[in-house]
């Protein structure tokens, strides 16, 4: 989950 951006998977 990237803040302010599209939700990306945190790895």
Swiss-Prot record:
Localization (cell): Secreted
Keyword Lipoprotein applies: no
GO BP annotations listed: neuropeptide signaling pathway
Pfam (any one): Periviscerokin
Highest taxon of source: Eukaryota
Main location: secreted
Keywords in alphabetical order: Amidation, Neuropeptide, Secreted
PTM-bearing positions, type Valine amide: 11
Example of a GO cellular component annotation carried by this entry: extracellular region
Extra facts: According to PubMed:19808072, a longer form of this peptide exists.
Functional note: Mediates visceral muscle contractile activity (myotropic activity).
Similarity section: Belongs to the periviscerokinin family.
Protein name: Periviscerokinin-2
Organism listed in the record: Bisanthe pulchripennis (Praying mantis)
